[in-house]
Amino acid sequence: MKKKIEIYIGILFLLLCGICAIGKDAFVTARDGRQEEVAYTNDYGGVGTGDLLPGTVVTQTVWVTDYDLTKIAVRFATMGRINRGQLEVSLENRTTGEILGNWTVNTEELVDYGYKEFEIDADKTQLSLENELAISVSCKEASEGEYVTIVRSQNDVLQGELTVNENEMSGDMSLRLYNRIHFGFLKKIYFVLASILYLITALALYIIMFRSGRISIKYYFLIFAGVLGMVYLFILPPFSSPDELCHFGRAYSWANYLTGKEPVQGTFAEFLTEEERASLIKATDKPSLATYAKMYGGYGQTPLKVEENSFHELQGAEIEYRPTNTPFSYAPQILAIMIGKCIGLSFWKVVYLARLLNFFVYTLLIFAAVCIMPKYRILMICIALWPMTLEQLASCSYDSMILGLAFLFIANWLRLMEKKSLYTVWDLAAEIMLVFLIASCKPFYAPLILLCAALPKENFRKGWRKGFWISFLLPVILGILYFEREVIKDVLTGSNVAWGDPELEGMTIRDVVLHPLRIIKMFFNTLLRNGQWYLYSAVGSELGWLEIRPSAVLIMGFIGTTVLSVIPAENETEKNFNKERMISLEVFVLSVFCIMGTLLLSSTYKTAEIIGGVQGRYFIPVLPLLCIALRGKRIRIEKNIDEKLICSMWILNFLVLIDVFRIISVR
């Protein structure tokens, strides 16, 4: 009894620490008038506008994205030269003709490829969304041969024009726009009270579970995933998860397509109308509590209703929403969108319904995986409770569906490895269906099918093994060729780079064949430079676009707890131990090679030194295989510590949520 009281006191202390941390930030940031970035130019691979010679004027027009603009920032490049001169910077509201600010810049103060910030007079910051601004930079004087330049993007990414001496130029000036945060002290207190209510509820659940005695480990996961997932679902603004907006747009296209809607003929020739596209593009503003204000304003409106004057936001918007991806990974979202449209839900209600169904399906898939696994249950639970996976399950990301299917496939494979009787048709059909769905959604997970090569031969009925492999490989290959035909075409021809400038040449298979040593070097450079970041980000070191970065100590805590979950207890016996380890390691290495190889051919420029587009979350579906491969027999734990590991994951997630509450409450 004394030990339990000590545990409760310790958890209560952590609870009070979290409340104090949230309250402190709520009080301080309510008084300091903090600002946040609301729009920026993605200047990846940026170039200059040309030397700013005396008399040169560079102007960028941009539409207002927020009512209360407080600051702008322009990115300059000095090319390593010291310039003794002056620049004039002005900001004009072209709609009203009002000058919002004039500034003089000494070029000696500029930092190479750094942003120079310009504060706007507080009396002139109240704008309207239909206002057009013009940012002009002119060179007043400069020392000869030592000129500076303004960084610009190679593509048109803003809704405006870039001109040099009134001559139009491609791309856009590298800018950042800021607004004042309007989340006052009283609202912050409400936010803190909501956080406290959650933490008290969670603590009550924790106490009830431990007072009730020993329960199955799978129910621990169901309760913890449910509580934590719902918190992430409502605490993180819509579209704050990586690529969430893009996936929601594709799901919306699929919903229109499956309900027999004709494609829109015109600029985009898609299954989204201009009104639908405008609503989605409007939601791409950097997520913050301003997003909640938009939601509140449009919560009762008809589906995808937008302001009449917002269609200028379509200018230059080249967001890809074609239903070229398989619909399987979007199934929960498609169902939610179809239901929402049928009953007339508003845009944001549809978004949250899609999030909720995605969360529900993912949780059921992981729960099913944990239920059928004969061992490694705690390992699967630990990875499923990482902050990154929790963020994905509570968003519209299609990665959550793929992750759930991959975990279920691995769980069923382990069950078949341990099975003593002959395999039934349903046993093998389940594996075939799961790997078909996984490979159709993301082909670089296709190596998972090789796990079945380790299945004991004696468990197959006579003649079944050969037929099993034919039934296995044929649908997987056909699924990849059909659903990913556009991607395969781009990879084979090198005609497109997914996350870059389509005008730049991408890597092709021909480059791989002609320069194998360079490709090997790129693989090693990528892993050596970014390997640690891939691991940390897979756990949750960077959550979405909100710059939520939990402490490195917490990330190491998640990794350490996951490693402990692999160590067997003394009373555990192993069947096919060495075979499982070897095949798991081989499939993991091959999967990593396929992931990086696919991104090499689809997202990497010919001039790049490392492979582009690789993200830590791509490795999560195959990470259990690495952990199984690292499992040994020599190191053992005296008794089962599964419940203690679950408690560790709960405490670590509690501390991460303190960070999430703290960062969200200051925005």
Task: Describe the function of each predicted region.
Residues 412-422, 446-477:
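Perimembrane helix-loop-helix junctions
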Residues 216, 345-348, 367-387:
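Transmembrane-helix signature of polytopic, membrane-embedded enzymes
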Residues 185-188, 483-570:
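Membrane-lumen/periplasm interface segments of multi-pass, membrane-embedded glycan/lipid transferases
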Residues 205-206, 352-375:
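Transmembrane-helix motifs of polytopic, lipid-linked glycan transferases
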Residues 395-402:
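Short acidic/glycine- and proline-prone juxtamembrane loop motifs at membrane-interface regions
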Residues 258-353:
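Interfacial juxtamembrane loops and adjacent helix segments
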Residues 391, 427-443, 448-454:
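Membrane-interface alpha helices of multi-pass inner-membrane proteins
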Residues 3-6, 10-95, 110-115, 122-130, ...:
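Beta-sheet-rich sandwich/jelly-roll-like modules and their strand-loop junctions
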